[in-house]
Amino acid sequence: MIPRPPGGLPLLGHLVPFLRDPLAFLRSLPRYGGLVQIRLGPVSAVVVCDLELTRHVLREDRVFDKGGFLFERVRDFAGNGLVTCPHADHRRQRRYVQPAFRADRIARYTEVMAREARRLAGSWNDGQEVDITAELSLAAGRSLVSTLFTRLPFTGLQETVDDFVLLIGGSYRRMLLPHRLNRIPLPANRRYDAARTRLVRLVDEVVTAYRADPEDRGDLVSTLVAADAGGQALSNAEVTDQVMTIFAAGFDTIANSTVWALHLLAQHPDIADRVRAEVDAARVDAVGVNVPGANAPEADALGVDRAEAGATTAAGTSPSVDGLELTTRVVREAVRLYSPGWLLTRVTSTDTELGAHRLPEGTSVIYSPYLLHRQPALFPEPDRFDPERWVGVHPQRGPFIGFGAGPRRCVGEQFGMTESVLLLATIMRAWHLEHVPGRTVREMPLATLRPGPVWMRATRRDGLVRTGAAG
């Protein structure tokens, strides 16, 4: 029999301690065994607390399929995209989406990433107090929309970002509410439905235009429209699902990991000094602020002058993260400590066994990268921020599962890591950031593990940034 933690209540089960402090509740479970049975209101689930059992779940994705109480609600927003689709659809969808994240495509996207990083770093004033959670969310949203679409047919960049962000925020609320309440025409539901309608219309019009003129525009949607697996292209509706999925998966990962990295570096000024030395030595002015073309006129609705993109990079090359090994390790360590996907679910598609326990078909299975990454048997001193633990370590071969594992490992891992490293390097090149006294930084385990507002004072590094330059 699978052990159960004490404290379960009639009807509620373990819902009270879970809602009170979800992260502490999760970290309390391994003492009861590698598999633990919990109940959250009407939902019964098995929590996997052991690394090898988790790897088995992720490896055997036909048996432990995408699903469960979280994924069913995510599909309401993201549709049947690569992240949310069942095993039966996954291989086909991956063949369509994989080309959009090849190294040569990511190299093209970095031009947009670098411009948005410069825009952000150039928008602050010396001594200004900024909420970097809000600032990085804006930068990540703009960058993602700009890499998805070269042009927006009937709306502006910020309006599109706002619609995506509204859907992501609303999706968590809708996960927690009974499904029938989401159909009531309340103001929040009307705003959510209107935003999704606008985005579906936007993607449909873009895809229709791209099919009529099938040149490669260098963006993600161009790759999806051109994808052809076995002589069959994606339909407009399928492209829409992939766009929703890519934005949802990338937005919080990029913004959150960069915010947590800045927060951790402010707590460890010795490591922050080493990062600044690295970005200075690597000449991050090639991707950062104060470089030729940084304030060139904007040529399209995205704020990206693509015709002059080469002017912003050294010797006409795309920005890269070469030479930023420590900065990359800092981001990786931030993802370990604060994995965006802190709680994920699968569902058994057939009767099976896990850890010598029988699981019937339809069992909800929970696994948590946050839980595994905080286990001392897997990561010595797991609560300590230590980028050096990644020296000479291949993340995919160890206990790190911040981007998943097995056949469903995140296809956009390199994309997300590259953007986070570019953002972090550009900010660290231009600014000293320190926490505003009296402000508390809170973990917010919602749909992803988000930071609450992180207020920091930005002090200019002399001569390395022109403030107020970004519009």
Task: Give residue spans per PLM region.
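Cytochrome P450 heme-thiolate monooxygenase catalytic core
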Residues: 2-3, 66-73, 85, 89, ...
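Conserved cytochrome P450 K-helix E-x-x-R motif and the immediately C-terminal K′/meander segment
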Residues: 12-33, 316-355, 376
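Cytochrome P450 proximal C-terminal region
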Residues: 117, 140, 165-166, 280-282, ...
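Intrinsically disordered, low-complexity terminal tails and inter-domain linkers enriched
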Residues: 277-322, 466-470
